[in-house]
């Protein structure tokens, strides 16, 4: 059994991680930390996990965490940096669900996250944990920077076109919408039920901190085809709990051929990417609580603009599920181990 440690397991990504690992046949959570909830039973804070965990939150301890085979950080941005150097020096394998090690340019990270980076020396060695791109690197990685939710949906949507150099990268557009859990568990007025329900709005249109991560990832995917890449990214708030829907737009360079076949062939062997039949369009409810990304692609009226629609669950493929997918790869397991259940409908 893989001994799993979780640092900061009281938020939405933490409980999602616990939910997934509760049914994982080759993993066992042996330690979960929280300074605020130390001594409290996991099942007391999360009653849905009663009968699945006989485990209490504890104060973070480097010595205890180093006894684990893998450590997940489900902490707010900026927290993992404080412990990471000691854990890596101690030989730990770490999967960080926060943004601390995603962006390679330190000055860019500090600008968008509004704080000094506490562990810049490890950023270059972190592997960006998007399995559809970096599977081989993930296998031997010691530190995984798990992608953000919007970046996952957008990169998977554009990926086949970028790899083949079929689109004009100078004016990409991503129009994305997320459920309220994308903002985390901390209370805020915009996320109150009476504020978010029965409404739909854009936010962060002048600049969202996922933008540099997305552009970095798209450039990595496109390589020589991504020179001069620029993305206009506008996120929106959905009146739902979970889910992300991204609608992506790009100008085709010329006759791109059969776009449906391109996507189907690229993702044919990806266990967590489902290319829908031509004419079908993805719905967020079809991926709820799953690690699946569902995609459709179309060139409306054949006017030279390609439109891609990509949906994920922001807490699963957009965070904790993708983290477990990375863990499975790191330990040579089937990628879908512990995550084969379909979405709940209705």
Swiss-Prot record:
Instruction: Name the enzyme's class.
Output: oxidoreductase
- What this protein is called in its record is N-acetyl-gamma-glutamyl-phosphate reductase
Q: Write the lineage as a comma-separated list.
A: Bacteria, Pseudomonadati, Pseudomonadota, Gammaproteobacteria, Cellvibrionales
Q: In which pathway does it act?
A: Amino-acid biosynthesis; L-arginine biosynthesis; N(2)-acetyl-L-ornithine from L-glutamate: step 3/4
User: Which SUPFAM superfamilies would you find in this protein's record?
Assistant: Glyceraldehyde-3-phosphate dehydrogenase-like, C-terminal domain, NAD(P)-binding Rossmann-fold domains
* Name of the coding gene: argC
Write the Enzyme Commission number(s) for this entry. 1.2.1.38
List UniProt keywords, sorted A-Z: Amino-acid biosynthesis, Arginine biosynthesis, Cytoplasm, NADP, Oxidoreductase
Record Pfam families: Semialdhyde_dh (PF01118), Semialdhyde_dhC_1 (PF22698)
Q: Where in the cell is it found?
A: Cytoplasm
Job description of the protein: Catalyzes the NADPH-dependent reduction of N-acetyl-5-glutamyl phosphate to yield N-acetyl-L-glutamate 5-semialdehyde.
Q: Where is the active site?
A: 149
Q: What is its main location?
A: cytoplasm
Superkingdom of origin organism: Bacteria
Instruction: Output the Gene Ontology cellular-component terms.
Output: cytoplasm
Q: Which GO terms describe its biological process?
A: L-arginine biosynthetic process
Family (UniProt): Belongs to the NAGSA dehydrogenase family. Type 1 subfamily.
Could you tell me which HAMAP family the record lists for this protein? ArgC_type1
| InterPro entries membership | AGPR_AS (IPR023013), AGPR_type-1 (IPR000706), NAD(P)-bd_dom_sf (IPR036291), NAGSA_dehydrogenase (IPR050085), Semialdehyde_DH_NAD-bd (IPR000534)
Q: Which reaction does it catalyse?
A: N-acetyl-L-glutamate 5-semialdehyde + phosphate + NADP(+) = N-acetyl-L-glutamyl 5-phosphate + NADPH + H(+)
GO MF annotation list:
N-acetyl-gamma-glutamyl-phosphate reductase activity; NAD binding; NADP+ binding
């Amino acid at each position: 059994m893989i001994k799993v440690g979780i640092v900061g397991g009281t938020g939405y990504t933490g409980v999602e991680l616990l939910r997934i690992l509760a049914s994982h046949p080759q993993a066992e959570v042996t330690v979960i930390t929280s300074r605020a909830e130390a001594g409290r039973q996991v099942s007391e804070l999360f009653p849905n996990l009663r009968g699945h965990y006989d485990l209490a939150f504890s104060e973070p301890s480097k010595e205890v965490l180093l006894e684990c085979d893998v450590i997940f950080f489900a902490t707010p941005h900026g927290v993992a940096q404080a412990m990471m150097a000691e854990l890596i020096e101690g030989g730990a394998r770490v999967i960080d669900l926060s943004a601390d090690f995603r962006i390679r340019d330190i000055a860019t990270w500090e600008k968008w996250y509004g704080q000094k980076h506490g562990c810049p020396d490890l950023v270059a060695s972190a592997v960006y944990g998007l399995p559809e791109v970096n599977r081989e690197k993930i296998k031997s990685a010691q530190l995984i920077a798990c992608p953000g939710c919007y970046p996952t949906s957008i990169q998977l949507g554009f990926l086949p076109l970028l790899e083949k150099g079929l689109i004009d990268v100078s004016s990409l557009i991503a129009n994305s919408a997320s459920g309220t859990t994308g903002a985390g568990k901390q209370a805020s007025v915009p996320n109150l039920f009476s504020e978010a329900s029965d409404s739909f709005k854009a936010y962060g249109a002048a600049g969202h901190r996922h933008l540099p991560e997305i552009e970095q990832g798209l450039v990595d995917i496109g390589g020589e085809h991504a020179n001069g890449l620029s993305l206009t990214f506008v996120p929106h708030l959905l009146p739902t709990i979970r889910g992300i829907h991204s609608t992506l737009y790009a100008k085709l360079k010329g006759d791109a051929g059969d776009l449906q076949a391109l996507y189907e062939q690229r993702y044919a062997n990806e266990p967590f990417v489902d290319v829908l039949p031509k004419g079908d369009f993805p719905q967020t409810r079809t991926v709820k609580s799953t690690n699946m990304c569902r995609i459709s692609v179309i060139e409306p009226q054949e006017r030279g603009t390609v439109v891609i629609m990509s949906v994920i669950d922001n807490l699963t493929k957009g965070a904790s599920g993708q983290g477990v997918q990375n863990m499975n790869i790191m330990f040579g397991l089937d990628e879908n181990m512990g995550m084969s259940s379909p979405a709940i409908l209705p």
